Amino acid sequence: MSSDRATIISPTQLIICVALFIGLFNNYSFFSQVWAIYPPSGDNLLFVGSLFCVLLLFTALLISVFAVGPLLKPALIATLLVSANTGYFMDTYHIVIDDVMLDNMLRTDRAEAFDLLSASQALYFIALGVLPSVAVAFAPVWRTPYLKAARARLGFLCACLFSITALLLLQGSSYASFFREHKSVRFYANPSYAFYSVGRLGAGLFDRATRPYLQIGLDANRAASSTRRKIVVMVVGETLRADHLGINGYERQTSPRLWQSDAISFNNAWSCGTSTAVSVPCMFSFLNHENYDQAEALATDNALDVIQRTGVSVTWLENNSDSKGVALRVPSLDFKHAETNSACDSECRDVGMIDGLAAILEETTEGDLLVVLHQMGNHEPSYYKRYTQEFERFAPTCQTNQLESCSREEIVNAYDNAVLYTDHFLGETIEWLNQLDN
């Protein structure tokens, strides 16, 4: 064999190299979970080694299905870039990349996306995504006739399946226990679970697009009332924990204005999820926590639709990313830009929406009125950006979006300062409403 021939690798070898690289460098979160369950010892080392081989073979199997012919290098590069990005967010924020998280990413606006960027992310992405992708792009690969390449790929797929099966059977009891008792660990397998989540998201989006829209509450009406119009303001918050509100007994008084206003706190309320894409549509849907289905909720009238149909003027004011489908059929105003929000500095503040309330009141002179304010609130991870300087009551604070570089005290202080600002916003809203009463 010539020296030139010896430096050229086969498509199968390139796939194995990429799968090995991902297994070694982009699965820190996965193996952190595994080592927490199986501390290093004789039998555990054997099982974890077997698990690594299964992960490697399954990744190679998954890549082999798509990395065929002219798609070989593009598919490998895409896999490397996806696994690097997935690995960064799992390693840094200790999250899993499921279909809900991907849905959030699709709905993320530019400001939110830039809020997540950091030097550490860039370095991580370059080292574990871009550089190996460049190596793949310039790797010399054998060119073989189509039928011969197809036979080789089929043989490799069969070899992967056989090897995975053999490994599972050799330690059957260990794998049975692992899959039965530690199901959540699979969420950290990179990139296989991310690819699975893409499939689930695609199926969910197709379901939403093809599901017929259902109107409900067509017989809803308002009972006769006094001639005095009713004006209701509803605030949809963002990432505000109930146990960090002074009004709920938190050790710090983070809600002095709510306390002074004699506000009532309904503390037996629960969100359907921890992401905006789930919690906001659920909040306004007629489904409950137990039977909530995203596709059904978005294809059915929500509370705003029914209220509007009864003759109430409904308006949605937006200072977050968007309404996640809730306000598609009611008037909405965007307050994320200085052109519409009078309280913008480094970012547009929630209090700017109060001017919007006054404008809506001037335009809607008759009938009952419901205005929903969707605030930026404590949107993570840049808590220090969510309040102005005069509300930095608790110090020192975390002054970066790289929360892993801050102490818990600094993160909590920045978070609580943002809660204070939300309390200020709510206090200003209540004061505006009180002026209407007067």
Per-range role (PLM):
Residues G23-A36, D207, E390-L403:
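Short alpha-helical hairpin
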Residues A113, L328, I360, T429-W432:
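Short alpha-helical functional segments enriched in proximate histidine and acidic residues
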Residues M1-Y188:
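Transmembrane and membrane-interface helices of multi-pass
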Residues S41-V48, S346, I411-Y415, V419:
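Membrane-interface anchor segments at the N-terminal boundary of transmembrane helices
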Residues L168-V235, T239-Q399:
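Active-site-proximal alpha/beta segments of enzymes that process anionic O-linked groups
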Residues A189, D355-A358, C398-N438:
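A long, amphipathic alpha-helix that forms part
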Residues L57, T108, Q253, L298-N302, ...:
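Short, conserved clusters of charged catalytic residues that mark active-site
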Residues V65-P74, A78, Y93, V306, ...:
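Catalytic cores of PAPS-dependent sulfotransferases
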